[in-house]
Amino acid sequence: MEGGGGSSNKSTGGLAGFFGAGGAGYSNADLAGVPLTGMNPLSPYLNVDPRYLVQDTDEFILPTGANKTRGRFELAFFTIGGCCMTGAAFGALNGLRLGLKETQSMPWSKPRNVQILNMVTRQGALWANTLGSLALLYSAFGVIIEKTRGAEDDFNTVAAGTMTGMLYKCTGGLRGIARGGLAGLTLTSVYALYNNWEHMKGSLLQQSL
């Protein structure tokens, strides 16, 4: 009986070795500290430490040549639409404020309501057109710079913002171009600094240690 059991164990071990499952395994003590996150099963037949298989973030299968993040062209539609809606909302509120201020001496009547409504629509369209035009120029410059350089980084953001300000204020002469470029440079630099603030803090902490 013992011989039969021994031969059975040998045959099982031989089959396990043939299929690659007879390598170095992990004991219960090794697997006790592995966190059970998600639906990841733990198997003693793995040839790697299961602790390295825990995924902190979602992983997606991307087509060949695809980027992990959206480029300037994909973000252009969201940027332009968001700026138009933001401008329309801000302009409507500003128009309501101006309409109430200009008609405060008038009693509540249909002419006053029409005047307030006209002010709301006029200011909403004005601000939506302004911010939408800026977003369109910024997105166009961003796409051109990205395609020209073949890279997507904060330099594209700052350069696109500076060129947008210069072109938007080009009708004001050299002084207007300088002011527009400086305004675009300042705003985009602050935006880039805000996006990289956590990374900069981590780098400074590592250098201090």
UniProtKB/Swiss-Prot annotation:
Transmembrane residue ranges: 73-93, 125-145, 181-197
Pfam families reported for this sequence: Tim17
Domain of life: Eukaryota
Record-level Gene Ontology MF annotations: protein transmembrane transporter activity
Membrane topology: Multi-pass membrane protein
Sequence similarity: Belongs to the Tim17/Tim22/Tim23 family.
Oligomeric form and interacting partners: Component of the TIM23 complex at least composed of TIMM23, TIMM17 (TIMM17A or TIMM17B) and TIMM50; within this complex, directly interacts with TIMM50. The complex interacts with the TIMM44 component of the PAM complex and with DNAJC15. Upon mitochondrial depolarization, interacts with PINK1; the interaction is required for PINK1 accumulation at the outer mitochondrial membrane, kinase activation by autophosphorylation and PRKN recruitement to mitochondria.
Cross-referenced NCBIfam families: 3a0801s02tim23
Function noted in UniProt: Essential component of the TIM23 complex, a complex that mediates the translocation of transit peptide-containing proteins across the mitochondrial inner membrane. Has a role in the activation of stress-induced mitophagy by protecting PINK1 from OMA1-mediated degradation and facilitating its accumulation at the outer mitochondrial membrane in response to depolarization.
UniProt protein name: Mitochondrial import inner membrane translocase subunit Tim23
Organism this protein belongs to: Rattus norvegicus
